[in-house]
Amino acid sequence: MAAEKILKPESQLKKAKYDEKKSEEFLKARAARRVANKQKRAAILERNAAHQKEYEAAERAVIDAKREAKASGSYYVEAQPKLVFVVRIKGINKIPPKPRKVLQLLRLTQINSGTFVKVTKATSELLKLIEPYVAYGYPSYSTVRQLVYKRGHGKINKQRIALSDNAIVEANLGKFGILSIDDLIHEIVTVGPHFKQANNFLWPFKLSNPSGGWGVPRKFKHFIQGGAFGNREQFINKLVKAMN
């Protein structure tokens, strides 16, 4: 006796076709995402290479200008820095209300916390008010990069989130053309048009006590007097390296 052919109910057939269609759509969508991600990675690498060329060109321009000045018997005057990195080196005790408010304004609410500040007439005045409680200076590209990659966190929905990949940066700063961690670094280093948004996105850096200590007999004297506080110009890079 021939086996009877068992027909599947129409609802099952429809579901099977639907599942097959969804599976095809899923595979197509996954393939499209892979292509898009590959293109995005290539674009980011291209932008990073352009940033690197920009940094190198700026360094060469300064070196060439110094050589020309020396050859002509004159002095090269460097452009006024546009960026400082500020580290709070004193706790909350014995800080008057006005400097305390400035520290809060600059988001330096804890000892050993650090933030980037755009140099303007207004911020220069603020730095004078809090000078006895902070160390600051002009960070190099290398210092900014190391800070962001090692200690960088973003402020997302009032939460402190580690910058573990480019997608976090793009999701929060993509509307400003900042698509990757290196784009973020570039915006900070160059004090670009969206510096404010980029800097506000960065959570204040939480640094450690300097390895080997402060190396000064009296911490709360000005840097130029052998202490730790105040403007240490390019020497901020050495301090950050010891605290990072």
Curated annotation (Swiss-Prot):
Keywords: Ribonucleoprotein, Ribosomal protein. Belongs to the universal ribosomal protein uL30 family. One of its GO terms (cellular component) is fungal biofilm matrix. It comes from Candida glabrata (strain ATCC 2001 / BCRC 20586 / JCM 3761 / NBRC 0622 / NRRL Y-65 / CBS 138). The keyword Ribosomal protein applies. The gene is RPL7. This is Large ribosomal subunit protein uL30. GO terms for molecular function: RNA binding; structural constituent of ribosome. InterPro entries: Ribo_uL30_ferredoxin-like_sf, Ribosomal_uL30, Ribosomal_uL30_CS, Ribosomal_uL30_euk, Ribosomal_uL30_euk_arc, Ribosomal_uL30_ferredoxin-like, Ribosomal_uL30_N_euk. GO terms for biological process: maturation of LSU-rRNA from tricistronic rRNA transcript (SSU-rRNA, 5.8S rRNA, LSU-rRNA).
